[in-house]
Curated annotation (Swiss-Prot):
Its main location: mitochondrion. Might insert into membranes and form chloride ion channels. Channel activity depends on the pH. May play a role in ethanol sensitivity. This is Chloride intracellular channel Clic. GO terms for molecular function: calcium ion binding; chloride channel activity; glutathione peroxidase activity; lipid binding. GO terms for cellular component: apical plasma membrane; cytoplasm; cytosol; membrane; mitochondrial membrane; nucleoplasm. The chain crosses the membrane at residues 42-66. The lineage of its organism: Eukaryota, Metazoa, Ecdysozoa, Arthropoda, Hexapoda. InterPro entries: CLIC_N, Glutathione-S-Trfase_C_sf, Thioredoxin-like_sf. GO terms for biological process: chloride transport; negative gravitaxis; response to alcohol. It is found in: Mitochondrion; Membrane. It comes from the Eukaryota. Keywords: Membrane, Mitochondrion, Transmembrane, Transmembrane helix. The gene is Clic. Expressed in cardiac tubes. SUPFAM superfamilies: GST C-terminal domain-like (SSF47616), Thioredoxin-like (SSF52833).
């Protein structure tokens, strides 16, 4: 197991890391090199949630990657067949996604504020990932259009609310859920079916621009190569030779002019 570089220890402004709870998040490692961050959506979502809390100095966060193709003996001993994400709080391991969310919301300082209640937004972003997977598998215009229609609805919502993020000018759990999925759509969609988010969806691009400015996203984001390989494995496609030697790239450019 390896620790990622974005470990957050709160020791500034006279506050010792021992004054706040120490939280460990175990995430899936890259399926290319087995060490860096992998392309698990839930892993990135909870990484972002916890990173935001670490920035607020309510917790000290340690993030550890595990190569699930060759899990180390101590991981197999402690967690058997369980796959990350796994959250460890004061020795207590939380193993299921819904339980992790509930634990962050109810038991981790500041977590309650991340989990805002907004039925409209919850409905708006659900099933987006399903549409991506259907597009990648079916590779037809109908599936492309279904995904495009969904993105248009998100764009219209952002335009109507005229806020920086989904529910306001402060990030919440919905943003930590949506943005990793948008990144997968952007990277995998382009690679496999030449799908691109249209430039006329200006509110959506502005939203992505704001997300790209945040350490919570950039520190948790997997490399383009890992996102692509994630779907190659699902489709039983082969890796390129010496793919582990490639320098990781991260697509974050914005193709339109963003006026603040």
């Amino acid at each position: 197991m390896s620790e990622v570089e974005s470990q957050q220890s709160q020791e500034t402004n006279g506050s010792s890391k021992f004054d706040v709870p120490e939280i460990e998040l175990i995430i899936k490692a890259s399926t290319i090199d087995g060490r860096r961050k992998g392309a698990c959506l839930f892993c990135q979502e909870y990484f972002m949630d916890l990173y935001l809390l670490a920035e607020l100095k309510t917790i000290s966060l340690k993030v550890t990657t595990v190569d699930m193709q060759k899990p180390p003996p101590d991981f197999r001993t402690n967690f058997e067949a369980t796959h990350p994400p796994i959250l460890i709080d004061n020795g207590l391991a939380i193993l299921e996604n819904e339980k992790i969310e509930r634990h962050i919301m109810k038991n981790i300082p500041g977590g309650y504020n991340l989990f805002v209640q907004d039925k409209e937004v919850a409905t708006l972003i659900e099933n987006l990932y399903v549409k991506l997977k259907l597009m990648l598998v079916k590779k037809d215009e109908a599936k492309n259009n279904a995904l495009l229609s969904h993105l248009r609805k998100i764009n219209d919502h952002l335009s109507a609310r005229n806020t920086r993020f989904l529910t306001g000018d402060t990030m919440c759990c919905f943003d930590c859920e949506l943005m990793p999925r948008l990144q997968h759509i952007r990277v995998a969609g382009k690679y496999f079916v030449d799908f691109e988010i249209p430039t006329h969806l200006t509110a959506l691009w502005r939203y992505m621009y704001h997300m790209y400015q945040l350490d919570a996203f950039t520190q948790s984001c997997p490399a383009d190569q890992d996102i692509i390989n994630h779907y190659k494995l699902q489709q039983s496609l082969k890796m390129k030779k010496h793919e582990e030697l490639e320098t990781p790239t991260f697509t974050t450019y914005i193709p339109i002019d963003i006026s603040e």
